[in-house]
């Protein structure tokens, strides 16, 4: 038999009310969710049967998804979507904070259409039924458009006293019938662009709506749940069978009560036998409460009139017939589930997160109902190895979540100074002898050799690093970070548990901020960690906050790179010029140059005597200049014979004086 499953479609982001942006398709075989990455959101689609990731798509940085929904198959005749949009597979509709609507093809693995109408704000509900597309923004503005052409068919605003809306729900049985939700429920005829009925259902924002059509009664039933509310209000609306929707025909037929606040609803029923419907409510604590035949109240079942109003309310209120929860061991709190959806009226698919893994399980709830104890089924599911490690890591990481923006942490400096001063005072009070100092030095050398031998092995280094990260042992971390062997660092990081990568990066950021001069070694650790465990890091929740310290430090260092590079260029230029001069780069030119002046001892006195003899027109400066020429040049100019004789006598006197000095020295 064909089964219609109506899984809940999420409309709020996780930051708003704790509900993630998730959606099951109608068969509950495909599951989509949106996760936060470093700088952009990621759309991930899973095969819930195999429990594996099927496709992943990285959205543009400026696009922030606010709601998602799978394509629904209407029961009425309609035009189909072209294959260039759907890729002969199912499509996913995504609404953004900027008012855009994106169409993602699961078969093609890419965005095939983007619609921007310019009149919508933040999209809180978007649906596609064949070629008919529908969207509503947070202010209640509704747009109906053609998926194939993108043409707007109609647009209007739902009148409401509420400032914000929470979703839009389309009927697959009746064309142009929709329910818009805020604090109230507005039944809207999309063809006439006006609300048929408006109901005040809850005091808080509605988070889930499910509905079912009973052909025998010609009634349209729907159930409504809201945030911070344990009650699920049930309503019915009579139809006239002419294709029109009469007004003022909505009645309250009862309420379903859960033990905790309702997170989402899901309903399944057989088309050929719609009275065998079953409704599942997921509560905030992770418990699933099952309601069989939810529209059949005790008052209708007994067929009697209540004697009082309180008795009537009691008959209209129903509690769950079965509760299902997943736990680590008997009696433990339930595991918080992310979403649920009916695969059939007898089986339910649930999904929850374990660290970065998404876990799926199909629960044959009708078969397990015979094993219930006091109406409760506890399914024990132990943690995986990765999850158990993540739990320990999370505790260690939370103990050292100090934010480092830049510079040196003054707190650590004060601690270091206090320790140093305390040790100094203690040393002054009790100073060891020379023999004790020698013994201590010998022990320290032996310990250093043993530690270096241990650290040199990559396996031992990986073990030491894991232990240091789990116990937050600073001395062990320091011994690991002192290793600057690239091969050892790379092998150690490869053998490190991926769940410890965020903690390692945080510790490296602290070391880098405290000791910037160790950047050469620490950057090798950071680079190897990002390369080896980058695939795991992008799947870590709230990664931006966890790596904020590292990002701030690296950004601060990168901002100084251009100025330091310019300074390095100037220093290289100056140093190269100095080296060139020291190496005697101008020796060749120096050999060719003539001396500026030549000085002869006793020459000036003889020139004074010559000038006093009355040689007019010839100065001592001219004699010095003429002396700098060779004998050939002087003869060509008609040199003075008296001066030549005087020069010859001076040279003889000079040589005689020199020989006299040599003899005296001997």
UniProtKB/Swiss-Prot annotation:
Top-level taxon of origin: Eukaryota
GO molecular function per UniProt: snoRNA binding
UniProt WD repeat ranges: 14-56, 60-114, 201-246, 259-301, 316-362, 495-535, 570-609
Localization per Swiss-Prot or TrEMBL: Nucleus, Nucleolus
Disordered: annotated segments: 603-666
GO annotation terms (biological process): maturation of SSU-rRNA from tricistronic rRNA transcript (SSU-rRNA, 5.8S rRNA, LSU-rRNA)
GO CC annotation: cytosol; nucleolus; nucleus; small-subunit processome; t-UTP complex
Family per record: Belongs to the UTP5 family.
Function field: Involved in nucleolar processing of pre-18S ribosomal RNA. Required for optimal pre-ribosomal RNA transcription by RNA polymerase I together with a subset of U3 proteins required for transcription (t-UTPs).
Protein name, UniProt field: U3 small nucleolar RNA-associated protein 5
């Amino acid at each position: 038999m064909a089964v219609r499953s109506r899984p809940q479609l999420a409309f709020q982001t996780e930051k708003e009310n704790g509900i993630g942006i998730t959606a099951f398709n109608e068969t509950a075989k495909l599951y989509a969710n949106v996760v936060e990455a470093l700088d952009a959101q990621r759309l991930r689609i899973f095969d819930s049967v195999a429990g594996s990731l099927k496709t992943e798509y990285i959205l543009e940085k400026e696009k922030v998804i606010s709601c998602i929904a799978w394509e629904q198959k209407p029961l009425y005749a309609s035009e189909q979507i072209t294959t260039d949009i759907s890729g002969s597979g199912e499509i996913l509709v995504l609404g953004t904070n900027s008012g855009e609507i994106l169409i993602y093809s699961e078969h093609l693995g890419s965005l095939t259409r983007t619609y921007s109408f310019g009149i919508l704000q933040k999209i809180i509900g978007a649906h596609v039924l064949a070629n008919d597309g529908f969207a509503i923004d947070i202010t209640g503005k509704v747009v109906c458009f053609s998926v194939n052409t993108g043409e707007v068919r109609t647009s209007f605003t739902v009148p409401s006293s509420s400032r914000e809306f929470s979703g839009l729900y389309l009927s697959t049985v009746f064309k142009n019938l929709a329910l818009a939700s805020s604090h109230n429920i507005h039944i809207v005829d999309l063809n006439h662009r006006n609300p048929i009925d408006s109901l005040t259902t809850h005091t808080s924002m509605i988070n889930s709506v499910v509905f079912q059509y009973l052909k025998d009664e010609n009634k349209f039933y729907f159930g409504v749940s809201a945030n911070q509310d344990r009650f699920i209000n049930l309503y019915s609306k009579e139809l006239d069978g002419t294709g029109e929707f009469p007004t003022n025909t909505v009645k309250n037929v009862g309420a379903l009560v859960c033990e905790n606040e309702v997170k989402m609803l899901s309903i399944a029923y057989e088309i050929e036998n719609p009275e065998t419907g079953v409704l599942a409510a997921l509560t905030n604590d992770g418990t699933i409460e099952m309601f069989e035949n939810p529209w059949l109240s005790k008052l209708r079942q007994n067929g009697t009139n209540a004697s009082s109003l309180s008795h009537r309310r009691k008959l209209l209120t129903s509690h769950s017939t079965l509760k299902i929860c997943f736990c680590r061991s008997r009696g433990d709190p339930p595991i918080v589930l992310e979403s649920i959806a009916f695969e059939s009226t007898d089986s339910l698919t649930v999904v929850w997160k374990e660290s970065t893994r998404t876990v799926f399980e199909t629960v044959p709830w009708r078969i397990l109902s015979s094993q219930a104890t006091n109406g409760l089924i506890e399914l024990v599911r132990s943690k995986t190895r990765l999850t158990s490690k993540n739990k320990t890591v999370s505790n260690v990481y939370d103990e050292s979540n100090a934010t480092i923006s830049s510079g040196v942490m003054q707190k650590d400096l004060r601690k270091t100074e206090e320790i140093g001063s305390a040790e100094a005072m203690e040393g002054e009070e009790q100073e060891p002898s020379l023999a004790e100092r020698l013994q201590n030095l010998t022990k320290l050398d032996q310990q250093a050799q043993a530690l270096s031998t241990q650290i040199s092995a990559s396996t031992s280094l990986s073990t030491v690093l894991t232990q240091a990260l789990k116990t937050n042992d600073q001395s062990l971390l320091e011994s690991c970070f002192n290793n600057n062997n690239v091969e050892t660092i790379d092998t150690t990081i490869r053998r490190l548990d991926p769940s410890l990568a965020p903690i390692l990066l945080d510790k490296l950021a602290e070391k880098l901020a405290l000791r910037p001069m160790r950047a050469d070694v620490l950057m090798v650790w950071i680079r190897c960690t990002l390369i080896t465990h980058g695939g795991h890091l992008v799947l870590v929740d709230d990664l931006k906050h966890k790596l904020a310290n590292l990002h701030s430090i690296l950004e601060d260092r990168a901002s100084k790179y251009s100025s330091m590079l310019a300074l390095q260029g100037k220093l290289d230029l100056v140093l190269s010029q100095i080296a060139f001069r020291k190496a005697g780069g101008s020796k060749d030119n120096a050999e060719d140059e003539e001396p500026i002046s030549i000085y002869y001892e006793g020459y000036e006195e003889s020139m004074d005597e010559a000038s006093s003899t009355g040689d007019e027109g010839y100065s001592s400066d001219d004699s010095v200049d003429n002396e700098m020429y060779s004998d050939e040049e002087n003869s060509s100019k008609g040199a003075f014979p008296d001066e030549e004789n005087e020069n010859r006598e001076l040279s003889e006197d000079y040589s005689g004086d020199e020989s006299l000095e040599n003899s005296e020295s001997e």
